[in-house]
């Protein structure tokens, strides 16, 4: 997803377009990895001195509710990234830097065979570890 797609979702849901929201979305698009709310606040503070953590967090949850961003828990805190919308896939997430890699393999058919008496409505697979770059820099 890019910033314009995200802004369209906001407008289609009757929400206001603001420069702050656009700039927040730009951070996600440019960095393209999982980020915590504090990182977003610090980046936003350069152009919007004194922006509150509450303002950032409210917008993050709004974006998440609209499907603009995804979230995961990493190192005991919520982290967010721009939503992937191109095709069904899963992610490898680096525990150090938050970088993600797409996993095109989906094990849902094997899981359905393993659990034949359940109804699966949805699924999300995240694999955690340390990326090559972080391993080299260790």
Curated annotation (Swiss-Prot):
It holds the Pfam family FUR. InterPro entries: FUR, Fur_C, WH-like_DNA-bd_sf, WH_DNA-bd_sf. It is found in: Cytoplasm. GO terms for molecular function: DNA-binding transcription factor activity; transcription cis-regulatory region binding; zinc ion binding. The keyword Cytoplasm applies. GO terms for cellular component: cytoplasm. Residues 1-85 are annotated as: DNA-binding. Fe cation binds at residues 88, 90, 109, 123. CDD domains: Fur_like. Residues 86-138 are annotated as: Dimerization. SUPFAM superfamilies: Winged helix' DNA-binding domain (SSF46785). Zn(2+) binds at residues 94, 97. Keywords: Cytoplasm, DNA-binding, Iron, Metal-binding, Repressor, Transcription, Transcription regulation, Zinc. The keyword Oxidoreductase does not apply. Acts as a global negative controlling element, employing Fe(2+) as a cofactor to bind the operator of the repressed genes. PANTHER family: FERRIC UPTAKE REGULATION PROTEIN (PTHR33202:SF1), ZINC UPTAKE REGULATION PROTEIN (PTHR33202). Belongs to the Fur family. Homodimer. This is Ferric uptake regulation protein. It comes from Staphylococcus epidermidis.
């Amino acid at each position: 997803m890019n910033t314009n797609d995200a802004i369209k979702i906001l407008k289609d849901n009757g929400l206001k377009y603001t420069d702050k929201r656009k700039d927040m979305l730009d951070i996600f698009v440019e960095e393209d990895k999982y980020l915590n709310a504090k990182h977003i606040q610090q980046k936003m503070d350069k152009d919007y001195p004194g922006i509150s953590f509450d303002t950032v967090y409210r917008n993050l949850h709004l974006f998440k509710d609209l499907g603009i961003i995804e979230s995961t828990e990493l190192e005991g805190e919520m982290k967010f990234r721009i939503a992937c919308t191109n095709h069904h896939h899963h992610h490898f997430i680096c525990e150090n830097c938050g970088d993600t890699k797409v996993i095109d393999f989906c094990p849902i058919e094997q899981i359905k065979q393993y659990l034949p008496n359940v109804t699966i409505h949805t699924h999300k697979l995240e694999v955690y570890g340390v990326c090559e770059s972080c391993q080299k820099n260790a």
